């Protein structure tokens, strides 16, 4: 397939990019530049558009045949971008440009049916109208395509994804994921990993919500239920994540007994109906394991309770609550002291709170501390009289000090 002469492609790229955020345009350019091996599309890639001789070699030996099938495509790239950054938009934009320019047959595959439905819906909503096949990763007779887009492309689907590749042999493969696992077999099988923007940057630029961080002493069905029931209005609609289904069941039971409308989302429940009820305000809290950690977008969610976990699950879970919602400009993330990976390592919260002596106490320094320091310097430089001293004390005693138990709404 001839991918030379990028003139028409660049024109189509400019047409698609007028709706994209700046970082999305950069990602789309990098993706096209690498997949088409053409630095004219994205000059900053330079020589990186050449094949990486080490790509895909650090893989699990027990799955070597599957990894080899995955690398059999002509070119493959993995877009690693945070939850809420618009990965579906970037994937659809890339597919639209390639289809308009070269007439490629496009396929979109995912592990979960709701991700396929979401991609099809956004294809229409964004106005891309890509002619594409939605393909289950378990399809035994998939259609032949030139470009295969793999949504949520991480290790859970390694075997199924490799099997799908062996049957389809697409010319180009584009993976989309927010999962930052360094050890992912799938990630290591792609020739190029494309990164551009971090969660911290997305929050700073307003594409993701600011958040306050709360730390429980222990994380259990009881502590989560008691926390939410202590102030339902303040915590708002929430999602609580647990390691085991029995824990999710117990938390939902306690919440229900306390007057909350709660449901457990698992592999056997009517997930689509539960999410619809939640979106329509008929449920207050969804309790789950990792079922809701992918492809669950609900901007109106105000709080997420994240079980103790490593970096990957923590980022997946906490990212669920960061989609902007006008009524809640600041969201809430609740973890515990025992977690292996506090989300505060990823992004800076507005305020940090810890639960001590039956109340939430602030760990955040007075936000006016710099201004207070400047005023102190000015006062020191001036002759101190009883009137000026009392005026300064009264003025600054009104500021919130460290250790306050006042929780911002």
Regions found by a protein language model. Give the residues of each.
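Conserved two-lobed SF2 helicase motor
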Residues: 127-138, 280-294
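Conserved helicase ATPase core of P-loop NTP-dependent helicases/translocases
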Residues: 261-290
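Walker A/P-loop
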Residues: 44, 72-93
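Conserved pre-motif I regulatory segment
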Residues: 2-77
């Amino acid at each position: 397939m001839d991918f030379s002469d990028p003139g028409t492609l660049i024109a189509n790229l400019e047409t698609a990019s007028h709706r994209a955020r700046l970082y999305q345009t950069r990602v789309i350019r990098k993706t096209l530049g690498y997949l088409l091996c053409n630095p004219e599309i994205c000059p900053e890639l330079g020589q990186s558009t050449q094949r990486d001789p080490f790509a895909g070699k650090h893989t699990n030996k027990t799955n070597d045949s599957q990894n080899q099938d995955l690398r059999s495509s002509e070119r493959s790239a993995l877009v690693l971008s945070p939850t809420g950054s618009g990965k579906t938009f970037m994937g659809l934009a890339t597919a639209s440009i390639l289809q308009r320019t070269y007439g490629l047959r496009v396929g979109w595959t995912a592990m979960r049916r709701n991700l396929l439905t979401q991609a099809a819906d956004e294809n229409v909503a964004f106005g891309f109208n890509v002619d594409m096949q939605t393909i289950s990763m378990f399809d035994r007779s998939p259609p032949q395509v030139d470009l295969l887009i793999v949504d949520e492309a991480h290790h859970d689907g390694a075997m199924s994804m490799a099997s799908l590749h062996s049957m389809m042999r697409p010319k180009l493969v584009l993976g989309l994921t927010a999962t930052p696992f360094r050890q992912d077999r799938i990630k290591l099988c792609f020739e190029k990993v494309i990164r551009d923007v971090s969660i911290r940057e997305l929050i700073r630029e307003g594409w993701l919500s600011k958040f306050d961080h709360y730390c429980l002493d222990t994380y259990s069905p009881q502590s989560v239920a008691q926390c939410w029931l202590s102030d339902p209005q303040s915590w708002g609609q929430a999602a609580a994540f647990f390691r085991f289904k029995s824990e999710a069941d117990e938390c939902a039971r306690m919440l229900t007994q306390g007057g909350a409308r709660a449901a457990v989302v698992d592999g056997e429940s009517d997930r689509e109906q539960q999410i619809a009820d939640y979106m329509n305000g008929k449920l207050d809290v969804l309790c789950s394991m990792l079922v809701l950690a992918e492809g669950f977008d609900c901007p109106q969610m105000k709080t997420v309770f994240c079980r103790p976990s490593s970096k990957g699950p923590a980022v997946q879970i906490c990212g669920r609550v960061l989609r902007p919602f006008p009524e809640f400009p600041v969201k809430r993330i609740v973890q515990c002291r025992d977690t292996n990976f506090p989300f505060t390592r990823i992004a800076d919260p507005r305020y940090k709170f810890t639960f001590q002596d039956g109340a939430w106490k602030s760990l955040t320094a007075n936000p006016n501390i710099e201004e207070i320091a400047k005023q102190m310097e000015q006062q020191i430089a001036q002759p101190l009289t009883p009137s000026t001293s009392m005026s300064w004390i009264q003025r600054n005693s009104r500021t919130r000090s460290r250790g306050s138990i006042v929780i911002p709404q």
